[in-house]
Curated annotation (Swiss-Prot):
Name assigned to this protein: Cobyric acid synthase
UniProt-listed Pfam families: CbiA, GATase_3
PANTHER family attached to this UniProt entry: COBYRIC ACID SYNTHASE, DETHIOBIOTIN SYNTHETASE
Membership in a protein family: Belongs to the CobB/CobQ family. CobQ subfamily.
Function: Catalyzes amidations at positions B, D, E, and G on adenosylcobyrinic A,C-diamide. NH(2) groups are provided by glutamine, and one molecule of ATP is hydrogenolyzed for each amidation.
Gene this chain is encoded by: cobQ
Length: 525
């Protein structure tokens, strides 16, 4: 049976996900079979597993840190907001319907508790350590009775809790003391250690505050984690994009429209990691400018976000950019927006039966009730100056969409779908305008294909008169995955040096590392 430990926070965005990621990598480095788990996650940024299930991206990164293939059991309940007060409910990877926040929190979520409990039992049998992530704060008194993500899960898993606070925003001590004060005595007893996150400066100046915190709460401080500059790991929450701007300068500028319901923005991480590329999220009120490439990303509600483009003037700005010869591409919902029309007679996304698109691609999208969830492989069909040189190039991605898109006569598809996991293939995906400068696809992760990404960036550089290497040199031999592994190791190394791992292993009831690690044993005692 596995041992378990849980990471909870004094608030959202204090660093729970990143600490779970680091612990998964540390325990893996130390020789343990470790698995991440989050009972209930709310996120727009999702991932499709090998068997066609949908799960949160944070647990995907944590699975990679643990050396595992992502599986829906790591995130049995996923809530994908469809509006300000409603979400699509996904259970063990499959959508079961939409639910208002009121209905969900007033008891209709309790049927999910048995699924969470059974999933935990399965993980206990298959792994040696389970690292569990909580959600938000465990001290939300109005939600606590029906909370499926925090203390109830800790009890089910028999997991001691590490409570994380973000000192960079100020008020960390008050947040810790206040959180513990709002917990029931038996819940506070489950908290076995405190972790201070995002610390900058002289640690000795913080020591008196830590001594006060331990004396006031009776809980040991098991780590003071540094503020890590320039850590290149995928973000799950669009809140993390508020200040995103990958470089002040770059040979190439790629502008991504920051939609109100943006989803799967990890599609652009590989572009952001490329040297000489500035990836800029264009937020409400900011000019689109004259970038080298405009991207309309995926969205949880295509209709509402298309209306946003019309209302803010970005629809006209994208059309002007295309008319000026600036390449424009759309991913999933962004692809649908580029077409002539969106039809929604079943009112899957809004109460509008139809809405005109941007008219940059001769395609029409109809929304249906059944969602396509699949990993897929395809080949570039060619078309226009960008794709004609790489016709036949293999690519891989994944699909998450409820729209069905039909191409107009004379419009070329972007990809031929060779295979969809779970069955299917032999059809086509995406579309390319006759100019070859406007294109769209349902393939999330298309920019993670090294050769396609290298060709795209090389072609953009050539348009600017910039130097470029061979396709293989530009591809960098899979730079994206190599960089991710390097960054996960960097994260683990930094946290290993600032966590009291001896006491954390003691909380788990384990003797400590099985394998020697460089620098092991250098953490605080």
């Amino acid at each position: 049976m596995a041992k378990a430990i849980m990471v909870q926070g004094t608030a959202s965005h204090v660093g729970k996900s990143i600490l779970v990621t680091a612990l998964c990598r540390i325990f893996r480095q130390d020789g343990y079979r470790v698995v991440p788990f989050k009972a209930q996650n709310m996120a727009l940024n999702s991932f499709v597993t090998a068997d066609g299930g949908e799960m949160g991206r944070a647990q995907v990164l944590q699975a990679q840190a643990a050396g595992l293939e992502p599986a829906v059991e790591m995130n049995p309940v996923l809530l994908k907001p469809t509006g300000n007060a409603a979400s699509q409910v996904i259970v063990l990877g499959k959508p079961v319907g939409n639910m208002s926040a009121r209905d969900y929190h007033l008891g209709k979520n309790q049927d999910l508790l048995g699924i969470i409990e059974e999933t935990l039992r399965r993980l206990h049998r298959e792994y040696e350590i389970i690292v569990i992530e909580g959600a938000g704060s465990p001290a939300e008194v109005n939600l606590k009775e029906r909370d499926l993500a925090n203390m109830r899960v800790s009890r089910l898993a028999g997991a001691p809790v590490l409570l994380v606070a973000d000192i960079d925003r100020g008020g960390a001590l008050a947040a810790v003391v206040g959180t513990l004060a709002l917990l029931e005595p038996e819940e506070a007893e489950q908290v076995r250690g405190i972790v201070i996150n995002k610390f900058r400066g002289d640690r000795s100046l913080l020591d008196p505050a830590l001594e006060f915190l331990e004396a006031r709460t009776g809980k040991p401080v098991l780590g003071v984690l540094p503020y890590l500059q320039g850590l290149r790991l995928p973000a799950e929450d669009s809140v993390c994009l508020e200040e995103a701007d990958t470089a002040a300068e770059g040979e190439l500028e790629i502008a991504v429209l920051y939609l109100p319901r943006i989803s799967n923005f990890t599609d652009f991480d590989s572009l952001a990691l490329e040297p000489g590329v500035r990836l800029r999220y264009v937020k409400d009120g900011e000019p689109l400018g004259s970038p080298d490439l405009v991207i309309i990303p995926g969205t949880k509600n295509t209709t509402e976000d298309l209306l946003y483009l019309y209302e803010t003037g970005y629809a006209a700005a994208v059309r002007r950019a295309a008319a000026q010869g600036i390449p424009v591409c759309g991913i999933c919902g962004g692809y649908q927006m580029l077409g002539r029309e969106l039809r929604d007679v079943e009112h899957s996304e809004s109460f509008r039966d139809e809405l005109p698109g941007l008219g940059l691609l001769d395609v029409v999208t109809t929304f249906v009730g059944e969602k396509i969830l699949a990993r897929a492989r395809g080949e570039v069909c060619g078309g226009g100056p960008l794709f004609q040189e790489i016709a036949g190039l293999p690519v891989a991605g994944y699909e998450i969409h409820m729209g069905r898109t039909v191409l107009g006569e004379g419009t070329r598809p972007l990809l031929r779908v060779v295979e969809r996991e779970g069955g299917g293939g032999g059809d086509f995906d995406g579309a390319v305008a006759p100019s070859g400068l406007v294109w769209g696809t349902y393939f999330h992760g298309i920019f993670d294909n090294d050769l396609l990404r290298a060709h795209l960036l090389g072609w953009l550089r050539r348009r600017r008169g910039l130097s470029q290497g061979t396709l293989e040199e530009k591809a960098g031999g899979g730079r994206g995955s190599t960089c991710l592994e390097r960054e996960l190791d960097r994260l683990a190394g930094a946290y290993r040096a600032h966590l009291n791992l001896e006491k954390i292993y003691a909380l788990l009831g384990l003797p400590g590392p099985r394998l020697p690690r460089p620098g092991a044993g250098g953490g605080p005692k």
